[in-house]
Amino acid sequence: MVDHLANTEINSQRIAAVESCFGASGQPLALPGRVLLGEGVLTKECRKKAKPRIFFLFNDILVYGSIVLSKRKYRSQHIIPLEEVTLEPLPETLQAKNRWMIKTAKKSFVVSAASTTERQEWISHIEECVRRQLLATGRQPTTEHAAPWIPDKATDICMRCTQTRFSALTRRHHCRKCGFVVCAECSRERFLLPRLSPKPLRVCSLCYRELAAQKLREEAREGIGGSPPQLSHLGGTVCGASSGDDDDSDEDREGNGDGDWPTQVEFYASGVSWSAFHS
């Protein structure tokens, strides 16, 4: 069915409509063989609070963005190749239902659907597309994934020292390796995580020690001679960095954020969270 629809006029029109909604800020989405399979609104758990996001499932990519005007205008487009995606269903709680994690090497995050049925539809459609894409490309499933960021609201104290209490003056930071919410003192180090960024990123003290030790072991195995590795901030001092010189926000940070979780009505005001174009 997907192959049959790949170069049809209706498929081209649907993809063009999505491109139009993102406008000049979005990337071109039309490619030979690409099929738009469905769309819907999911709730993405962001750093400050959970927010509705529009998602589009293609046969080879997953696209999502912020909703400015439903079915008219979107922004902050993100494109995820499906061969990099792994899904992880999450357990139900009284406060959080119909959730699962979308994991990739560069970014992992939690989303939820309006109902159990819609959650299962999303998961089954994505997993089938991932399976087909891996088969087509001959690639193996990704085994290393970025840690999802713990939401700010999850804790009022540093998750490493458990002493520092966050406030308007004492800001939260996130370790890029484990995703924990930590204070400035417990996240003074930077470490190069090539899968995430070409620049050294903020990591917590525990992850830094583990990463530095791993790097030393790897260099020892490779038999690298000469002087020891230049880990200039091994003692805990960040080279040219302070608690506020790097961007601790993700792409979903808007305004100053009050940390309150939207109600379920706000989550799903745009309607059902899965709409298949091609069944």
Curated annotation (Swiss-Prot):
Region described as Disordered: spans on this chain: 220-263
Compositionally biased spans, kind Acidic residues: 244-253
UniProt keyword terms in alphabetical order: Apoptosis, Cytoplasm, Lysosome, Metal-binding, Nucleus, Zinc, Zinc-finger
One Pfam family in the UniProt entry: FYVE
Chain sites annotated for binding Zn(2+) 1: C158, C161, C183, C186
Positions bound to Zn(2+) 2: C175, C178, C204, C207
Localization of this protein: Nucleus; Cytoplasm, Perinuclear region; Lysosome
Entry comment describing in which tissues the protein is expressed: Widely expressed.
Superkingdom of the source species: Eukaryota
Gene Ontology molecular function: phosphatidylinositol-3-phosphate binding; phosphatidylinositol-4-phosphate binding; phosphatidylinositol-5-phosphate binding; zinc ion binding
Summary of the function given for this chain in its UniProt record: May induce apoptosis through the lysosomal-mitochondrial pathway. Translocates to the lysosome initiating the permeabilization of lysosomal membrane (LMP) and resulting in the release of CTSD and CTSL to the cytoplasm. Triggers the caspase-independent apoptosis by altering mitochondrial membrane permeabilization (MMP) resulting in the release of PDCD8.
Domain notes from UniProt: PH and FYVE-type zinc finger domains are required for lysosomal location.
Annotated protein name in UniProt: Pleckstrin homology domain-containing family F member 1
Organism encoding this protein: Mus musculus (Mouse)
